[in-house]
């Protein structure tokens, strides 16, 4: 992306801020459904900053701009933010201020900080509002500046909705909704709004391609004791899918109708998952409706897999293993022959996977990092960075696939030929860390941070570490 475009967008945003009486604007990495993976339409943080990592927060004031991200993306962010107005803020590194701390220094007491409430969950908005207030700053739910400033903004995805057969789901949508209603009744709540796309897909037994590398549909679901409504754009439904959903007790209404329906929902109480329901939707419920804040009612049920799902996972792993072994058999001779690059081997691995039954696509963009590129967390080769593979050194390969009966993710570090002594040492130290971590016994309640010591111990003994 041309760096001058970022500068122009930041200046246009500052004019927007002047017009709306804002001293700063905050762009998170989320969408109205607060999922981990975001359709292009809502990638406003990437649009304003040029940084395309999956995690990060961009903040623009009238005079400065900064981007916060974690250690996975330090190297990528350093490169992508060069020659832009954005300074890199390294999260969880001593001395790095929080967004609120930085803003308190930049705009001072009484400053107005704008956010788009459609992409902040109720919990996130509440937490940021409190932290800003502690520093004497006000949080303002503003319009989405990208709505007017983002030229050629991608549309909200319109891919067709597909049914997920019970042969792979193991349980009908009608039965899942029945169980959800029982849980609502046990909580003495009349209704719930399901916002997370993976939870909507699981509950309604539907799949789609609205999110890159994820079989998801952009939709909401409203469930009461009397009805279940799937809010999804009409263009995505054919008659067969609509009829099948109706047979499961699911009515379909246009995606945008939720905004009109919530204020007249006619229930006295609703349970909202404050971590996935966006702030704007929470505001739309009528004042007489009691909002019961809580966690998701779907996630615990979705996490307990039935026998059909478990068998599906096993079968998917088996087929994916076949594809991986075929690829590994092909790889070394191909590298010795020459003309193989990070991108070419990624494509070849995808070819082997596509030969397997029930293959639907990649589960994420393949990470093929050769030599120094293997040290860049979440590295993604492109035409500019792509490099030739030689019959020496290490290739990091992190890849996976979506099958109709399961999802896979496998990482391997492959020696393409002769290794240097240091490469052997580093590989062995990492392997020892894996073994130590796999063998450790730990008490319930232990944290990942505590167990991380086991993974790093062998390296620390040799005076090396990783971020």
Residues covered by each model-derived region:
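Active-site neighborhoods and metal-handling regions in enzymes and metal-associated proteins
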Residues: 1-467
